[in-house]
Amino acid sequence: SWTSSNNPVNLWTDGFAAIQNVNLFLEKVDEVHWTDDEESRKLFACRLKGEAYGLRALHTYFLLRNHAGFSNDGELLGIPLYDSYLGSDANFNQPRASFYDCVKHIYDDLDKAEQMLPMEYNDISNESEIPERFQPYTSRKETYNRVMGHYGRQLFNALIAKGLRAR
């Protein structure tokens, strides 16, 4: 409902703007020189992509929750889905995807986020504690702690992705 603190039109505009920003980030993330250390650079890119997929899922969820509805023929519709950045010359006049396709899109993004993020951002005390999915990126605890350790607390993590999936 409309209130002084809740404007559904702003949510539509702001939500799609956020998704556009995430899509642009995902296209550019591998080009960014995050650090001179190659292992850290790759692990940062992995983490930041995971956070981006999680944020895209979150914004898609909020848009779907607030703007899904039934068509004239009774089909439950979601929102238009964009998984790549659209330039100013793109056709933004896209039909709404089905509600099912929107939920699947959210789950797919959450799957990617969970694969790229730690359950929680905590330091480890030795190399044997590096989660298996991050071992291709680094074998050093210092690198893992720098990127996935306690400095990352309060960021989107796999636990948040699981919580969003449960909603």
Model-derived segments and spans:
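Conserved, well-structured interaction surfaces
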Residues: 1-69, 92-101, 110-120
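Acidic, Ser/Thr- and Gly/Pro-rich intrinsically disordered linkers and low-complexity segments
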Residues: 127-149
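Short, flexible, mixed-charge acidic loops at enzyme active sites
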Residues: 70-85
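Short glycine/proline-rich turn/loop motifs
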Residues: 1-6, 86-91, 141-146
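Well-ordered alpha-helical segments within folded domains of soluble proteins
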Residues: 18-26, 81-84, 159-164
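Outer-membrane beta-barrel proteins
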Residues: 12-13, 36-40, 143-159
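Aromatic-residue-lined binding/catalytic grooves and analogous aromatic/hydrophobic interfacial grooves
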Residues: 110-125, 131-134, 154, 158-167
